[in-house]
Amino acid sequence: MSKLRKKYLEHLLCVLIFFTYVIGYGEAQSKSFLVDCGSNATTEVDGRTWVGDLSPNKSVTLQGFDAITASTSKGSSVYAEIYKTARVFDAVLNYTFEGITQGNYFVRLHFSPFAIENHNVNESSFSVFADGLRLMLDINIAGEIAHKNLILESTGHNATASSLVKEFLLPTGPGKLVLSFIPEKGSFGFVNAIEIVSVDDKLFKESVTKVGGSEVELGLGGRGIETMYRLNVGGPKLGPSKDLKLYRTWETDLSYMVIENAGVEVKNSSNITYALADDSPVAPLLVYETARMMSNTEVLEKRFNISWKFEVDPNFDYLVRLHFCELLVDKQNQRIFRIYINNQTAAGNFDIFAHAGGKNKGIYQDYLDPVSSKNDVLWIQLGPDSSVGASGDALLSGLEIFKLSKNGNLAHLIRFDSTGHSVSDSKMRIIWISVGAGIAIIIFFVFLGILVVCLCKKRRSKSDESKNNPPGWRPLFLHVNNSTANAKATGGSLRLNTLAASTMGRKFTLAEIRAATKNFDDGLAIGVGGFGKVYRGELEDGTLIAIKRATPHSQQGLAEFETEIVMLSRLRHRHLVSLIGFCDEHNEMILVYEYMANGTLRSHLFGSNLPPLSWKQRLEACIGSARGLHYLHTGSERGIIHRDVKTTNILLDENFVAKMSDFGLSKAGPSMDHTHVSTAVKGSFGYLDPEYFRRQQLTEKSDVYSFGVVLFEAVCARAVINPTLPKDQINLAEWALSWQKQRNLESIIDSNLRGNYSPESLEKYGEIAEKCLADEGKNRPMMGEVLWSLEYVLQIHEAWLRKQNGENSFSSSQAVEEAPESFTLPACSNQDSSETEQSQTGSALHNSA
């Protein structure tokens, strides 16, 4: 009897367990709602059952007037079946979802425009609210899709989007959830499908790291979230069926990369796990099986980073979630990198292996970034941390960007028309087309009148040299103030010849220029650039000059030409190439400089048959160019940033005095209340400041970085980028820096220097170059400090030379002992200060050679 009772109790227990499971499963299922709008049937899509909103359903009720259904046979996406119908409304429409338990829910709204009888989907406009939270405002679905395709086209990808899914995360109390669709007055709206999916509370943490700051509380209990982007970095697109917990879609990252070949895809599908078991809802393991890491073969400047660029709505807070999984290295300190979000350092010294506790373990990091009202772009960038000894590489597996609600709003204020352009832009285009047409008519008649006058003048007068005039050149206007170098520009437009009496020096005739260059003989060409050619010339009195003749058709060259004129008309210094004069006859644009007899510094280092420079000559050349740069940075109120410091822009005169040249890319420094100048990245590969490249923020420290590359180039005598060398030697800055950090720079110096330099001077020289190449500008010295240090290095070397020659009046060890621990440098040396004063008073140009 006891056995029978025991068996009975076992059966009863099994039945209770079964019913407990069924009830629990039913409650879990009741948390999710899948609605096929405009349909009266149930449809199986992505392994889930979607119920038509016309089917009897106590959990979902539909309230609204004049709501109609529409259907189509089109569709090829995973959701094609539920996109065949839609709910169309021209009055307020409410969907009420009953039986909601307290917690967080993904609300996904599906839109797929198609032809609807008596309605033009291109003109639909409506708003959506969820329990008082505004999700969308006067949205035009066709315009949103067209705008997405425009972005894809701009990045060179196929524009194939035909539908739109808006995903929101909403904190909801127990009871019900009401979604309200409100058409704009006189318009209508539509929706194809709605899904409400319960979300684990562990998906988002309340406390996150603010970019550039400390831990902050998100306050998610009272805020809604919109998913802006969700990417499977380095891997294929993952549809909802690949993310069975939350049925999310993970796009590929290629269309958002700034430079696609900056990163390569890596994959490892074996034994991938979560670092923490609770992280399973965060992302499917498939996301962690692939990644993108920095490319060593396609990107010459390995210090640069992988960058992704995203269009966002201004004036919102954004939660950036980055997914990582170390797939290759098998111990700590092998891959260490930095994370940058919108030009700020979010994390430094980031080691995936250390954070995850091993290889093949998926982790994620959250960062909060407030985007200002003036910014509509969010940058995500990863780059190696040069301050540590790990490999120069970075890796990312996944990326998500979430917008946080502000004052009960998630809707963006920018509206797009059916072409994908903002409504304000469309209106302005119509206005400008009308205005442009009127202006074109006026210009036509003005041009016609000018043409008649010119033809009449041509009949009366012919120029002997008209046959040599270059075509297509436009007059050059300058915006400069010719009173003092420190005075602010007035913005007045001055033609070149109006500057002759002030800062531009002598005005040459075209006949004089032709005579000096033997009619622009190519045999006298000594340089060429985007602006045109540079010729060696000789005046009647035997004075040698350099003549820069601009190419009429080069707009880029023209802009640089104008910049150089503005800069040189304000600058006078012994270590800057001097402007002698100009010529603007017959629409020519010609500048005349002092002739630098010994050419570029690079030509004396490698690539020519010229005799190599001694160590002392190289130091003196570096000191001279440093003096010129120091003057640029400090010689005026805002200073000037050269932006193209390299050995081909350092010229040597007949006495090997070094002078900076080529100011076509130069930029005025930041004003007193700013720390940098925001500008597009320009410069020469191999010399570019990586921080400037990442943030597009220019400072004088960018010149310091480039000068650090010059220092290594001067001592190693090789190209800064040489793709024919082994990978670790391609980039001179990285290669030399690695040897310098080992305190073994002498192993890679120019063989012509061996035995002819002071070891102590080389050691100090290497330390200066290393400081110049610090990854962050704030850790680099000022150019004045670099100048002082180089002068000190020269003293050490000269003391060594005297000792070698038997002169013991001053030893290199004494020089080391006398060096101060810290130092400051006045704005200019005595010799240069007089030149600065002369520049500021706008006195006549003199030849400083």
Swiss-Prot record:
Glycan attachment residues as annotated in the record: N40, N57, N94, N122, N158, N268, N271, N305, N343
Record PROSITE patterns: PROTEIN_KINASE_ATP, PROTEIN_KINASE_DOM, PROTEIN_KINASE_ST
Signal sequence interval, chain numbering: 1-28
Binding site for ATP: I526, G527, V528, G529, G530, F531, G532, K533, V534, K548
Transmembrane segments: 430-450
BP-aspect Gene Ontology terms: response to brassinosteroid; unidimensional cell growth
Keywords recorded for this protein, A-Z: ATP-binding, Cell membrane, Glycoprotein, Kinase, Membrane, Nucleotide-binding, Serine/threonine-protein kinase, Signal, Transferase, Transmembrane, Transmembrane helix
Extent of Polar residues compositional bias: 827-849
Positions of the catalytic residues: D644
Subcellular location: Cell membrane
Extracellular side: 29-429
CDD domains: STKc_IRAK
Catalytic EC class: transferase
GO cellular component, one term: plasma membrane
MF terms in GO: ATP binding; protein serine/threonine kinase activity
InterPro entries named among the record's database cross-references: Kinase-like_dom_sf, LRR_Rcpt-Like_S/T_Kinase, Malectin-like_Carb-bd_dom, Prot_kinase_dom, Protein_kinase_ATP_BS, Ser-Thr/Tyr_kinase_cat_dom, Ser/Thr_kinase_AS
Residue ranges annotated for the Protein kinase domain, each copy included: 520-793
Topology within the bilayer: Single-pass type I membrane protein
EC number: 2.7.11.-
One Pfam entry name: PK_Tyr_Ser-Thr
Entry's family note: Belongs to the protein kinase superfamily. Ser/Thr protein kinase family.
Protein name: Probable receptor-like protein kinase At1g30570
Organism: Arabidopsis thaliana
